[in-house]
Amino acid sequence: MSYSPLKLALLASYLLALNTMAAPTIELEISNHVFQPSVVEIPAGQKVRLLVINSDSTPEEFESYELNREKVIAGGAKAIIFVGPLDPGDYPFFGEFNPKTAQGLIRVVAP
């Protein structure tokens, strides 16, 4: 049995969408240039979707060198950032536009 490239592409897209939907969502809010909660625990070895809600009127940049993530989130906007699967440990993140106040930590714990 042979499959056309289009059918294979559709199947790959479907499987990717299923994997993305299966990732648990954790909400982070930026308010008054502070991430809330400032510490988030996630299980090791699992992909997680961070829903970052910027309640401020100004943009903020979610940045983490350890996670290799960087995303500007406009004021009053939301963004989705996928992380993981990760090994146990602490992974700091910060808001590049307000680094003194916008700081947080993703703590990855063994199941």
What are these regions (language model features)?
Residues 1-9:
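Bacterial N-terminal signal peptides that target proteins for export
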Residues 17-19:
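N-terminal signal peptide c-region/cleavage motif recognized by signal peptidases
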Residues 23-45:
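N-terminal edge beta-strand
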Residues 24-27, 74-111:
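Extracellular/periplasmic metallocenter environments
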Residues 29-31, 43, 53, 65, ...:
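A structural detector for beta-sheet-dominated domains
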Residues 39-56, 78-86, 92-94:
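Beta-strand cores of secreted/periplasmic/IMS beta-sandwich domains, seen most often
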Residues 55-75, 104-105:
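Histidine- and aromatic-enriched segments that form or immediately flank copper-ligand environments
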